[in-house]
Every structure is written in C-alpha cells, then in structure tokens.
Amino acid sequence: FVRACAEAGLTFIGPDAAHLALFGDKAAARTLAERCGVPLMPGSAGAVTLEEAQAFFAAQNGAGVMVKAIGGGGGRGMRAVLQAADLPEAYARCVSEARAAFGVEGVYVERLMLHARHIEIQILGDGKAVMSLGERECSLQRRFQKLVEIAPSPSLSEKLRHEITQAALAMARDVGYRSLGTFEFLVDEGSSELPWVFIEANPRLQVEHTVTEEVTGLDLVQLQVAVAAGRSLSSLGLDPQAPPASTGYAIQLRINAETLGADGQARPGTGMLAQFDLPSGPGVRVDTHGYAGATPSPHYDTLLAKLVVSSRSPVFADAARRARRALDECRITGVPTNLALLQAIVSRKEFD
C-alpha cells in the first residue's frame, strides 16, 4: 500500500515501505537488534518447522517457549508453551492465526520469560535524527492483549530506563527511522542473566499513544503528520539531546465490548448501546466511537473507548485514585463490557 501511494504521487503518513517491511518481520527485527548489540531472548533466527520448534523446546531445560507468528501483532499468533505435549497444538494454532490475520504462515520460537514486565519506548524520527518521547508500561494484559497502559512506568529503575531507551534509539538510528515507532521490551529486574530483552518494534502510532501525550504535552498525531510533510525534528522545536520531560502519570484503560466466560475467555459482546455516558473533567480524557443507539460490530476490534486519566502529581497512587473514580462514573448499558474487570484491576493494592 505504501509503495502504491508513492507510485500515485501520494504521501503516506507513517514509516516508509522499507521500515514497514523490516519491522513487520519479527525475525528481521531480531537480526537488527543483534546487529545493534541489543539483548534478545534465545530463539530461532527465522521461521521454524514443528520439529525444529520441538528441538528448541527440549534445549531450554524446562524454561518453556513462546511460539510467535513472524508477521503477527495485537496479541494474535502467539502462544506460551510450558509442556512439550502442548507444543504441536500451539504451533498449529499460531500458523493458522497468522495465515488468517496476516497472510503469513511462518512462526519462530523464543525462550519464555515467565516473570516479565512489558515496557515500550516511543520513538520519533525524521530520517536523520531520532529521539525518545519516553516509555510506557503495558504489563497488564490478557492473553497478550493490552488492557491498561501507563506512562511513565512506575516500576522501572532509572538504570534500566536509560539502558532500554538507548537500545531503542540505537536500532532506530541504525535504519534512519522516520515517523513514529514503538520499540518493545520484556523486563525482569530480578534476573541476573537477562534483566531485559528486545521483543519487537511496531512502525506505527500505537493505541496507547494517549498516555505519552498526556505526560509530555505533545500531540503525537500532529507530529507524525508534520514529519510526513517533510519537517525535521529541529524545525518542530524538538531536540533529540533534550527530550521532553514527563510530568506526573497517565493511565489508559481500554473499555471493550465483551463477555468473560467461566473459562476466562473473552468473547465479543453484542447488542445496542442503550446508555453510553463516560466521565469528563480535569485529568480525564475519552477517545471513543461509541454513542447511545450504536450497535458495535462483533467482527472487528471490540474496543469501545479509551478512558485516559492523568495526574501531575509525582505519586502514581494519585493517578490510580483518579482512574478508580473515572471508572465508577462510567454508565454503559445494552452491551456487555469489561468495566467490572477494569475496576477489579485498579482496586487491587498491587496497582498502587
């Protein structure tokens, strides 16, 4: 599509075709990370057969593996495997999901990091210079799909924040990255062997860009459009050597139209939105396509709204309290949602 835009004389707002191809191939992204000296989980260099995946699993001495689609994303085409007997089914399902969702069947394998936190670095480049706009914590997930995102991470040490940010910048510089991009990492600060590793890069604007906007005061969509129009970072008043500081904390809560079965499996919720009243006020932002009378389609993403709260306080618990109040003010009827799940998450003492 990007090449077709160029051939038609149109400017695609986003990375160029080469960067989309590179980061759309997770195995190629691993190769880039290796070239830049960025830590990786032990894994295959490219697509593997089931027999090769089984041999890799056996070599991990019980650590388990992640089976991932080379062209996957959004939590699809991924399976964690802890028992050898489960590997054939996981492999087959990843291949099937990858074929259906992305048109690519290849899968690769990595050692499983059991106690990982998910940290991502927001990058902006103009083709010559690149800079970091801070990190986001996306550890609260269900079946590898994000539910709650936070900026900046309240759990990351300054040492690891610096190391991970520099790794993301090194990879972006190596390819002369242009546009917005997100470099994603797994972190286990308790590990002496691999406290953090690169997992993938997403060459696009992320759903959770909102929390970065709230703590930096930057409009990421506007910046992406400006870079696509040929503007440099310096012409936009941005200095890669002096990235914008974060103020306080922001939390994004994904309100989905879904039901949660007894088996823990989420399924799309259907019906007509009879009531759709979401909170407003200082420190509360809502991005949504929902409205009373709407009938969300069960055939696409179940996301109804992004509820984003922010606090300028340096104490994360203050933002967490605002999140609890905002969720309590939501009134949605007619379609089942995950509001109760989100309320349960932010009410746990571990969340503060």
Predicted segment positions?
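Short acidic loop-to-helix transition motifs that present clustered carboxylates
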Residues: A45-E52, L114-A116
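Residues within well-ordered alpha-helices
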Residues: F1, A28-A29, A53, L341
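Conserved thiamine diphosphate
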Residues: A28-G46, P154-L156
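Short acidic active-site motifs
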Residues: E52-A53, D86
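Short, charged, surface-exposed secondary-structure boundary motifs
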Residues: A21-K26, E52, R142-R143, V211
